Amino acid sequence: GRETLERVYADCFGAEDALVRPQITCGTHALALALMSNLRPGDELLSPVGKPYDTLEEVIGIRPSKGSLAEYGITYAQVDLLPDGEFDYDGIKKAINEKTKLVTIQRSKGYATRPTLSVKRIGELIAFVKSIKPDVICMVDNCYGEFVEDTEPIQVGADMMVGSLIKNPGGGLAPIGGYIVGKKECVENAAYRLTSPGLGKEVGASLGVIQSFYQGFFLAPTVVSGALKGAIFAAKIYEKLGFKVVPDGTESRHDIIQAV
């Protein structure tokens, strides 16, 4: 059942707890759930890796939207990567203040052309942030990155990791769903936000999709491996045709995204 599935997710990703539900409809929904459940009015959200996905702009309130974090009095700060793709450590240090409650780190390049972050680099960034403010929550948007490397962000210090089952961990079989893994308190907060205070993870029909969640998760490493091989193959072909590709056919890969 769902309880065992969540224990499997927590164990595989090295987390204390997990929330894996079909009621989480997509990656953006999972991220919104994680943010809204762990931030309160007066808190500040910091992105030390530049602008997040376009879909998160309305969640945060960068673009005005009903129900955004901004509407609830949660502020947002952003530190862009340096031109060479490195972290702006000085800028990050200046941006962290007494209001900074949660730091969100987007692993994948997504729809941009900036470098995807390796788990090692994510760990270095988390260690730096924690050295300045140890109690800050470090959340990693792990979309497109699961099973690409042999370690995951939780194993290098992330307090919370979020992703979508219609990407890597669903193995192409999960028709819907998202996950949040990490510290027990963070996951519990998300569960109470998903359903209701006092109910949390105890309710919510699985609607017959649990088998596809298990099978997809079992197949996910193989499916991700195939996606990486296809991306490398496509990169080499388009390079030979004269196109600019990011990453190129020889670079180390930390997600399944290929830009042409």
Locate predicted features.
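Conserved N-terminal alpha-helix of the aminotransferase class I/II PLP-enzyme fold
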Residues: G1-G27, I62
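Short, solvent-exposed coil/turn segments
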Residues: G14-A15, Y72, R253
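Conserved PLP-enzyme active-site core in the AAT-like
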Residues: T25-S225, K229, A235-Y238, K244-V246
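Short glycine/threonine-rich loop-to-helix capping motif typified by GTGT followed
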Residues: L219, Q258-V260
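Conserved thiamine diphosphate
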Residues: G242-F243, Q258
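Conserved glycine-rich beta-strand-loop-beta hairpin in the small C-terminal domain of fold type I
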Residues: T250-Q258
